[in-house]
Amino acid sequence: MRRFLALSVTVLALTACASTPPKVQRSEFEDIPVPKGLAVDLNRSTIIESPTVKAARIFYKGRIEPDSLGVAFRTTLEANGWKHLSSTTSSDKGTTQVYEKQGSSLQVLIYESWYYTWVEMSATRMVGSASAQLRQ
């Protein structure tokens, strides 16, 4: 009986120490970092590409405090050259942050459900010749 108990404890301890490899954060735009702890929900997300425009509405979910998530987004986006235009917070609709960068726009909506904190990122970017015309 003691052997069985010792074996059971050992097996439980070893399986508790096992970990899955970290998920790579997915972002359709290389200059829009996604904070760790968020998982993309591809069933709710939409990505559209044309010769002149790339647009995406991507949903992420996680168990992160919304206020700290808002600070993390603002800090990392500004570090990547995004200009913060505005932020609004509403008790029933969460926090909306709006950013711009040459040829690109981004809206980040952070809100809570009963279990997850959700992030809805809507981004558009001019690509190809349309982007070159904007720079002139």
Name every feature range the model reports, one short phrase each.
Residues 1-8:
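Bacterial N-terminal signal peptides that target proteins for export
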Residues 8-10, 23:
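Detector for intrinsically disordered, low-structure N-terminal pre-sequences
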Residues 13-16:
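C-terminal motif of bacterial Sec signal peptides marking the signal peptidase cleavage site
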Residues 18-136:
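An acidic-aromatic pocket/loop used at catalytic or ligand-binding sites
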